[in-house]
Amino acid sequence: ADNVCAEILKHHGECIAVQANVSDPAAVKMPFAQSISHFGSIDLLINNAGILLFKEITNIQDDEFDRIIDINFKSVFYALREASTKISDNGRVVTISSTVTRMMLPKYGAYAATKAAVEQLTRTFAREMGTRGITANIVSPGPVDTELFRVGKTIQDIERMSAMAALGRLGKVDDIAQVVLFLVSDEARWINGQNIAINGGII
């Protein structure tokens, strides 16, 4: 977060970094309060916190399941609930999901379930907030070359998943960021409640 802030400040923008436990409903209030205190208002929310649990269902322990539910699912609920009263009219919300919700990939069961859940939360939020001009959309990346993606995977796993895309490569962070940037712009004002796949052609 500090590196991102430094980059923003270098380009003459404004930035603050706030650390909070997104699985704690009380803690989720803090970034909203500090953002309003510093900037005066909140215009957009990106739900991007998440962890990966890469295990077959039979091997998932109760504490592991609880943790991924807390971080991937409950955090989005808490953030949307807080945003419902804090985000400005005509604001923008983007939730990061995953292409795996549309597939049957081994070892992705718990992760895919949390992402499917936040997709529905976001669609419902879009409906509930629409009269205020607030849009809420979902982006569903395919395999993107990040530290999170590589958790628990062998070289063979990574090569196999790279080959799934018609473009024949892993995604890059910027491939996703550019679509998110569009969705929070004025040009996307008539896009609402949608799920946009960004996966290089995984069908």
Regions found by a protein language model. Give the residues of each.
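Active-site loop-to-helix junction immediately N-terminal to the catalytic Tyr of the SDR YXXXK motif
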Residues: I60, M104-A112, T124
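Active-site helix of classical SDR
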Residues: L80, T114, T122
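Residue(s) in the substrate-gating loop at a strand-loop-helix junction
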Residues: S98
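C-terminal helical subdomain
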Residues: I138, R160-I191, I198-G200
